[in-house]
Amino acid sequence: MDAPTVGVEEEFLLVDPRTGAPTARNEAVAHTAGELGIDLQLELTRCQVETSTAVHSDIGALFGQLRDLRCGVARCAQANESRLLAVAIPPTVPHEFPVTDTPRYRRIAESFGMIAHEQGLCGCHVHVAVPDRETAVQVSNYLRPWLPMLLALTANSAIYRGSDTGYASWRSILWRRWPSAGPPPYFRTAADYDAMVTMMLSSGIVLDEKMVYWDARPSINYPTIEVRVSDVPATVGETVLLAALVRATVHTARRFLAEGNTAPAVPAEVLRAAYWKAARSGIGGDAVAPLDGRVLPARDLLDELLETVDPALEELGDRGFVSDALTALLARGNGAQRQVRAFGADHDVAAVIAELGAATLEGCAPEPANSGGGEHVPVEGRH
């Protein structure tokens, strides 16, 4: 079995450099990015942008491109009186979340009301190559029990509207307001998956297939399984750690399925409990093991995931990177833990913004970008 390729999409928040409040400047930032040759996509609200990488076989190359994209887009934001933050929800009180002015996004806003207008949420999507749609559906079944662990590991949305939410990933709680969001159902075949999507389309639960927001799904545009469970991680290193773990889990799933096995059908109720626990506690508290309902420390469940995917990590050449990246993350905390520390007893939102700004551009030396000249037509993101 060939090593699968991997690609990543990251969503970012644009904020005012002085106040940290979201700024509605995504079209201007995308215009500047286009002049610099950066493919930057618009998201549902005008406070958000999305980057996407090329397809990579090598994790080191993925790391380099993600870092360069963050550095470049940060310069474009700076040129338009904005700051780029890798954070899954706004830490400050937003004045508004105006919807990006495209026909599709206007239709979504008209159909879903306040859910759309409060959408300023940023995630990270990892695409891993699979041979066909049937394989993607079966791999999704295998991934279901591990999705809460991936959420806990990368949680980056503890502070919202000037308050400590008490959750590591408040984004994941808000995100589930969409009728098509959350854990993917268990499907016996790709035909069953397609039948469910057809029902959702005919009922108006989704307006198009791009709005099937399950946390793992066959990609619409690429021959991949797309894993969408994560908050946008605070640092490039954490994003690449996520990508490496997702790729290894997909590779493990394909080996498992090739041996004639069938993924366990974890009950939706157990999976929802595991999701809630992951959102609440992140990597620092307890977790629910979806396969058997055990309650155990999240780090112990992480060890079980690592043990499961270790042969794949070795085969793909990613074991060393994952070991080093996890050691660093667990030593200093993930994005949510660092937000809470910065917020502290003084409820210092400015310190949270400073922490996020530094983490977003780790390894960068951003400089002001020049704007002007030419015409660039921005592209919608994948919401």
From Swiss-Prot:
What domain of life does the native source organism fall in?
Bacteria
Q: Which residues form the signal peptide?
A: none
Broad EC category: ligase
Q: Which BP terms does GO give this entry?
A: modified amino acid biosynthetic process
Tell me the InterPro entries matching this sequence. Answer: GCL_type2/YbdK_subfam, GCS2, Gln_synth/guanido_kin_cat_dom, YbdK
What EC number(s) is this enzyme filed under?
Answer: 6.3.2.2
Keywords assigned: ATP-binding, Ligase, Nucleotide-binding
User: Is DNA-binding there in the keyword field?
Assistant: no
Q: Which GO terms describe its molecular function?
A: ATP binding; glutamate-cysteine ligase activity
What reaction is this protein's catalytic activity? Answer: L-cysteine + L-glutamate + ATP = gamma-L-glutamyl-L-cysteine + ADP + phosphate + H(+)
Q: Does ATP-binding count among this protein's keywords?
A: yes
Task: Give any Pfam family that matches.
Answer: GCS2
Which family does this protein fall into? Answer: Belongs to the glutamate--cysteine ligase type 2 family. YbdK subfamily.
Q: What does this protein do?
A: ATP-dependent carboxylate-amine ligase which exhibits weak glutamate--cysteine ligase activity.
Stated name of the protein: Putative glutamate--cysteine ligase 2-1
What organism, scientifically named, is this protein from?
Nocardia farcinica (strain IFM 10152)
